[in-house]
Amino acid sequence: MAIAAELERRGHEVTINLPQIFEETVKPYGFKYVLQQFDDIGVMIDSAAQNSHKFRPFLKWMRNVIDKQFDQLIPLLQEHDILVSTNSEFAVASIAEYCKKPLIRTAYAPFLPGKKIPPAVLPFPKPNPIITPAILWKLMNRMTNFMVKDTINKNRAKYGLAPIRNFGYHAGERSYNYLLFSQHLGNIDPDWTFKWSIGGYCFNDTFQYDEKAYEEMISFVDSAQSPIIFFTLGSCSSKDGNRFSKALVDICKKHDYRLIIDSGWAKTGITLQADKHLFLMKQPVPHNLIFPHCDGVIHHGGCGTTHSVGRAGKPQLITPLIIDQPYWSYRIHQLGVGPEGLKIAKASEQEIERKVGD
């Protein structure tokens, strides 16, 4: 939505195709939008974080999404001049090719095959001299081809397009790859062979929020002078989130810190009793209005939260769960702006306390 707002500010006409869970969020912006016709992403994000889903249902869901994207996006794109998409939308390169329209493919981590940086979607962000990034990318491409290539080629045949041989390289070659992260927080591979540029993160400072919720948070901030820690899992969830929250509360009481918990989509920590040490944020408030008041932030490691904490100049501890979050955890520790990441499911209260001290 931040990208759409900026494009409209520059005079472009924008239509957003978005998951159903964001309908109420997008309405205040006044954008023209079309809801996706396939199963909502929210359930899959939740089950991925919980490690509760099986591979076959996920694979079936993904292939169904590809079929529905061909059905819905082709007539939409034919009415527009350019397609802007994330790199995780597997059908878009073929859709843009069929419609003969340019594709800008965005990414929130270095998701381009290369020789120096491992695939950010794998939980092995540190380059290994034996199992090299190039080897991991080959494995990644084989896995992606297994998941999506046949479904994509089935739809390409339906629309008279030749089959693809390798999804990763086809998508990279048929698009302009625009990296939506900071070159100072993330890293790049100068040897990438695809068309790409890096533009930094697009912060959504126009985020619509509840003024009363913000004022309640500020009242908590102003109520004392003791240090404030902020904890959020963003749009993710973890079955250990409530245990982790309780441990943070106990640590803050022990050291006379204060804690703000953003309950988020999963209502993390919602059963805890608020007091002078704890504020439960039940309504979303923009990061740029929160983080300047905090002394440290503990979070899941999403690209947006990582960049927002970095912009506020605050130390951060990442508890990575899925996708690119281990990559951002690795980068934050590598850059020295936060301690080594913490696995939320395995961390003891003593280990959490040590990390908070760091």
Located regions from the model:
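A short, Lys/Arg-enriched amphipathic alpha-helix followed by its capping loop at the start of a domain
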Residues: 3-12, 25, 250-255
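Conserved nucleotide-sugar phosphate-binding/catalytic loop shared by glycosyltransferases and other
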Residues: 15-57, 126, 131-132
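Donor-nucleotide binding loops and adjacent catalytic segments primarily
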Residues: 181-296
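Alpha-helical membrane-targeting segments
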Residues: 55-59, 116-158
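Long, low-complexity segments enriched in small/aliphatic residues
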Residues: 148-199, 207
